């Protein structure tokens, strides 16, 4: 896909003005980093705040009297029990019990659900949703009508509160519970604000009309200027999520992986019926052949696709790897046989034809302190 055919978010001009390096990603031209670099951006989110343009993500609305049960059967987690004004992480699975995508479902109204899907999977997910929901509910793809801005970090709530007015009287954005979602005005624009994110820090995601994104973006940057806010590209977004041990579709999870081996059994509400439930239950009963583990790599930076070695034999593969700026170590996620998945197991990763030492460790690599 050439640059001329790449999609651009409504904030493209803002990124260019800020000096961002723009790269192709999932059919979009997105900022990978800004002039100060990925490590500086990463540390800003851990220590203060960062603002992200996530408008490339997909948004699908499911509405109507049949929406609750339709989405509950579609998603692995308990959606039937999800209260209005709450969100829940879950999986879209196929009948084989492997992962079509990981999503967050927001219950905005009694009969209105918003499913946020990964940018690379919008068309595939939309077809999957339509196939399984059928005529039970109304489905709307709002991906190109919805802008998404995230503010993440320990100072996110202070920054958000200065430019946000909730539609609920006598409430502030700081009152919003984790995985809560509420109607609001952000920088003067109507929005839904959720206390969700992909960094391992406290933070918010703001869903806005596509043509109203620039005002809130500039207001949030201005409001957070004295508090250390920085614009954050996809590069730091990846290092942040990896330290927090969040899965990336196409790396840790895809249609060749099941939730049990991927460490996502907790998202599967096996007491209910959902697409792929029976196949997943069978894997859980017999046990998976492999599991995803966290690694600390001593002699280099492991990358996606690098081989994991034990006793001179290739036993697995790295799904993601980086230097973790917060933890100060080279970290990775990898699939290995169950017998080698125990914390403390000594392995190696083959980097440039050289086997470097690696050790299985507990994840997440970084967990923010409770406040």
Describe the function of each predicted region:
Residues 1-26, 30-34, 108-371:
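Conserved, structured C-terminal
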Residues 1-90, 98:
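Acidic, proline/glycine-enriched N-terminal capping motif
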Residues 41-45, 96-99, 103, 187-194:
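Membrane-targeting and insertion segments and their boundary/processing signals
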Residues 53, 102, 205:
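Acidic active-site catalytic centers that drive phospho-/nucleotidyl reactions
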Residues 65-99, 157-189:
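Internal amphipathic helical hairpin motif
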Residues 78-132:
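Well-ordered mid-protein domain cores that form the structural environment of catalytic cofactors
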């Amino acid at each position: 896909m050439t640059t001329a055919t790449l999609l651009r978010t409504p904030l493209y001009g803002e990124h260019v003005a800020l000096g961002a390096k723009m790269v192709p990603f999932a059919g979009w031209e997105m900022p990978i980093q800004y002039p100060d670099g990925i490590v500086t951006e990463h540390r800003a989110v851990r220590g203060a705040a960062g603002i992200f343009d996530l408008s490339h993500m997909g948004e699908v609305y499911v509405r109507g009297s049949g929406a609750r049960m339709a989405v509950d059967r579609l998603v692995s987690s308990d959606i039937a029990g999800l209260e209005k004004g709450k969100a829940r992480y879950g999986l879209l699975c196929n009948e084989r019990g492997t992962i079509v995508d990981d999503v967050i479902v927001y219950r905005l109204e009694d009969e209105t659900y918003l499913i946020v899907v990964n940018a690379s999977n919008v068309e595939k997910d939309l077809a999957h949703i339509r196939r399984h929901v059928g005529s039970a509910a109304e489905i709307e793809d709002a991906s190109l009508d919805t802008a998404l801005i995230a503010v993440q970090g320990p100072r996110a709530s202070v920054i958000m509160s200065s430019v946000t007015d909730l539609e609920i009287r006598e409430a502030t954005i700081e009152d919003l519970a984790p995985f809560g979602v509420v109607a609001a005005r952000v920088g003067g624009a109507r929005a839904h604000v959720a206390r969700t994110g992909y960094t391992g820090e406290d933070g918010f995601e703001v869903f806005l009309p596509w043509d109203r994104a620039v005002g809130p973006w500039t207001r949030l940057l201005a409001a957070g200027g004295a508090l250390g806010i920085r614009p954050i590209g996809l590069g730091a977004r990846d290092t942040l999520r990896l330290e927090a041990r969040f899965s990336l579709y196409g790396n840790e999870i895809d249609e060749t992986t099941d939730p049990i081996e991927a460490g996502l059994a907790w998202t599967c509400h096996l007491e209910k019926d959902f697409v792929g439930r029976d196949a997943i239950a069978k894997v859980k009963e017999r046990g998976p052949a492999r599991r995803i583990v966290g690694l600390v790599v001593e002699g280099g930076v492991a990358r996606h696709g690098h081989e994991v070695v034990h006793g001179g034999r290739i036993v697995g593969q790295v799904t993601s790897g980086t230097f973790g700026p917060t933890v100060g170590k080279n970290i990775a996620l990898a699939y290995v046989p169950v017998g080698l998945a125990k914390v403390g197991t000594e392995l190696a990763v083959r980097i440039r034809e050289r086997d470097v030492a690696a050790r299985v460790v507990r994840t997440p690599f970084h967990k923010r302190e409770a406040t």
